[in-house]
Amino acid sequence: MVVQTLTYGIRLHPSPAESDLLDRTCTAYLSCCDHVSRVAKSNRTLSQRKLNDLAYRHLRETYHVGSQMAQSAIIRVIGNYRTVKESLGDPWKTKRPLQYTSSGYDLVWNRDYSILSDGRLSVNTLKGRVKLQVDWKGMPEQYRHGRFGTARLLKKRGKWMLLIPSTVELTDPQRPQNVMGVDLGMRFLATSYDSSHKTTFHSGKEVTHKRAHYKALRTGLQKRGTRSARRRLKSIGNRENRWMR
């Protein structure tokens, strides 16, 4: 079996009140990320335990987020600084703390979001769970039943989307039983050779003859140089192109 993970963008259709709540939730979440980022850099620590001690209570009391959202912000910031470390060798090499503006709200499967039996999406917000209408056309049926990972809630051009990574198991592709190689040319249009050691030649004699025929016609008409000859040249060119296809 082959395991494959793909991320699909799913369109959400919240009501105006729900959209406003999602806006406020994302703003609070990103503010949490900004605070954790400043704390992590000033204390030069990526320890989840230490960041919990330093930032968790402040996030809950200042931004009025739930426990899971506070933890999600801490985990996201740790992951982002680790990415900086991988690329620069030092997570603290940037002059300023990492900033979070419009990069969305991370949702953990079965904690922050889940799928209801009627296909709607249940999402954790500042005011508890909301149930949203979803357009599932962007995700193939097979991946709708895959193993979902941490999704990201985004607003693009005034429209809400959820980016969902889905992991599925695929059957191994069948190994080909017969392999054929094809060489293209002029004298022989194609020469094929297959796994049973059979060689087949496809002659280009007819094509060569046709090309010579049209070339002779064009040469004669070009020598005339009349208006009717030019119209005839164009007609012949179109006919030759159709024949070659």
Residue ranges and their predicted role:
Residues 1-245:
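Nucleic-acid substrate recognition interfaces
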